[in-house]
Amino acid sequence: MIKIAIDAMGGDYAPNAVIEGVEQARDLFEDTVFLLYGQRDVINAQLKNRDRIQIINADEVITMEDEPVRAVRRKKHSSIVMAAQAVKDGQADAFFSAGNSGAVLAAGLFIVGRIKGIDRPGLVTVLPVVRNANQSNFVMMDIGANADSKPLNLQQYGVLGTYYAERMMQAKHPRVALLNNGTEDDKGNKVHKAAFELLSQTDGINFVGNVESRDLLNGVADVVVTDGFTGNAVLKSIEGTARSMLGLVKDAVYNTGISGKLGGLLLKNGFNEIRSQMDYSQYGGAVLLGLKAPVVKTHGSSKAPTIVNTIRQIRQMVSTDIVPGVAEYFANQQANQQASVDIPAEND
């Protein structure tokens, strides 16, 4: 059985949306047990059926106003901290929360812990590809865990993203690209130029060079690596642009009188299809990849369908052994580096 620890109190619509999503997922996935961490009385009042759902009382809640690291260190009986601790103690295979993003990241780093050899875990998300019959989505990493990144971090994101694309999206020989301000090999600042060289020399990944943000949704790569500041800005830009453009088109159609309104009715299904295609919550939450177990941050406004998608995502991560695969890669890398150091120099 797969066991998932869940912060029942995190998110704009918690605990109702979380509980509703968990109950729907429980009915879909017979091999999964759910550990709900939160205020027992509140959860019990909302829960309709406790089959394969365990409630663990958490007296404290980390709010959106709490300073993340301080809250994780001080609120030991909060739902986020207790869920993360369950993973560390082997009581659960993974945990997720729609609550305070910084606290989820801090709990992942300080409690669940990094895989040996990984400098900084990063947040990975899946985004849609439009107007490309051969590709429907791509992975982008980092989208906000680390505002600043070293070349080594970007190189490791290429490896982590490759594992994610292969095992979660069934991408064969996923193309890895570095987000930059031009496609030429010599583009970018010192960090990006150094990262380009590292990625070019990395075994086990299919590095295809630099990519510009304007081409991301066209399917130019399966994995796009970037620092967390840029990745988060690009993600929000995509969200905002898609929302604004759809609104502009709808206004243009509906503001042209009766004929426009009739045309709008005919186009309604098309609008809904576009909205659905651009909704990346269908892929679940953002994964803090590089930890010893799956830790997923879902959007604060997540409702039951997104909770179900996140649980589906976690089940796939556990069943496809992404974390053990990543750990083995970096263990072998460190072993090879040590072996090269231990080789005695030849006598002249």
UniProtKB/Swiss-Prot annotation:
Entry's Gene Ontology molecular function annotations: phosphate:acyl-[acyl carrier protein] acyltransferase activity
Residue stretches in coiled coil: none
Annotated metabolic or biological route of this protein: Lipid metabolism; phospholipid metabolism
Keyword terms, alphabetized: Cytoplasm, Lipid biosynthesis, Lipid metabolism, Phospholipid biosynthesis, Phospholipid metabolism, Transferase
Major localization class: cytoplasm
Compartments where located: Cytoplasm
A single GO BP: fatty acid biosynthetic process
EC number(s) stated in the UniProt entry for this protein: 2.3.1.274
Record's subunit section: Homodimer. Probably interacts with PlsY.
Function text: Catalyzes the reversible formation of acyl-phosphate (acyl-PO(4)) from acyl-[acyl-carrier-protein] (acyl-ACP). This enzyme utilizes acyl-ACP as fatty acyl donor, but not acyl-CoA.
HAMAP family listed in its UniProt record: PlsX (MF_00019)
PANTHER family reported for this sequence: FATTY ACID/PHOSPHOLIPID SYNTHESIS PROTEIN PLSX, PHOSPHATE ACYLTRANSFERASE
Protein name: Phosphate acyltransferase
